[in-house]
């Protein structure tokens, strides 16, 4: 029927979902096989960097800078890509709040502002960030799929992410 998406489109959605699950749960071993071909395999060894290698390949994995930040209400860990691996769209901007893959304009802006002047215009960075925060500071019920979130302390969230990204990019040799 005309309402069914093509097999390729569906496979693309599944592939993306598997990548998001593997990246947000490096402690779990995933193997995704499509048409007898292994599309994704992760070891479950707790290493986000190894999952990034499995999903995105060596070129990306080699160009990562590790970030770690903590304040009284949030913790940020993960990797930001060196500016030279930026891309023409936002598909490489992945971040997880309390283990859940989400989208949020404030986080996206903080990340991209952190790269200002370091990537060309209309280029977007590679990031894989795990953000942990208290549930009281977070509203996940904005969207039925819980993909969008809102924060009680938007300014503090922006500042923490911006400074974490900016610092690692500008203080490297």
List each model region and its residues.
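N-terminal phosphate-binding caps/lids of nucleotide- and nucleic-acid-binding domains
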Residues: 1-173
